[in-house]
Curated annotation (Swiss-Prot):
Subcellular location: Plastid, Chloroplast
Cross-referenced Pfam families: Ribosomal_S3_C (PF00189)
Single Gene Ontology BP annotation: translation
Protein name: Small ribosomal subunit protein uS3c
Originating species: Phalaenopsis aphrodite subsp. formosana
Disulfide bonds: none
Domain of life: Eukaryota
Subunit structure: Part of the 30S ribosomal subunit.
Encoding gene (name): rps3
Domain KH type-2 stretches: 43-118
Family label: Belongs to the universal ribosomal protein uS3 family.
Listed GO CC annotations: chloroplast; cytosolic small ribosomal subunit
Keywords: Chloroplast, Plastid, Ribonucleoprotein, Ribosomal protein, RNA-binding, rRNA-binding
Membrane-traversing stretches: none
Matches recorded under InterPro entries: KH_dom-like_a/b (IPR015946), KH_sf_prok-type (IPR009019), Ribosomal_S3_C_sf (IPR036419), Ribosomal_uS3_bac-typ (IPR005704), Ribosomal_uS3_C (IPR001351), Ribosomal_uS3_CS (IPR018280)
Amino acid sequence: MGQKINPLGFRLGTTQSHHSFWFAKPKNFSIGLQEDERIRNCIKDYVKKNKKISSGFEGIAYIGIQKRIDFIQVIIYIGFPNLLIEGRTRGVEELQMNVQKEFHSVNRRLNIAITRIEKPYGQPNILAEYIALQLKNRVSFRKAMKKAIELTEQTGTKGIQVQIAGRIDGKEIARVEWIREGRVPLQTIRAKIDHCSHTVRTIYGILGIKIWIFVNQE
């Protein structure tokens, strides 16, 4: 039976790069890793609390962290920055202060920058959030998957695969449903593939969403 490997970890160093970039002594590595996790969780919690109610989702593709001895640079790659910044002139400063408090760092400066992604629906995290929102609003899972694929095709990707697992449409027995459009060569290491796993809590229980997007081949 074929073993499933995470396509991002499988391609690290070839088509994928790390979202955290820093060096540490082996004994301090776990501390640095926990710091990164705290920073990311703090940012996501802040965005969740301050996002527009009407939008329903955060739109964060990923958070990049670069560390030096006395400085930490955090870059938030977001699809819809207006959801976070609009109507709030000090949005980024407030977020920076929140993270700094959580971080308890005296000797290191922290800087947060927001980078807008040109084609947000080409990012699997944003697409998974979109599908999750549709499922919460009781839209048919097939309709949600097809609409997500239509949105992705507009960004010029070469292929996409969407998978939803769990008690779909409230059925007694959990099952897996998936749909693919175009090519998704998971076995080819030089193929640049973006992937994400996302969970959504519906009235019937938790559903798992997985998305693979074939961007291009190097």
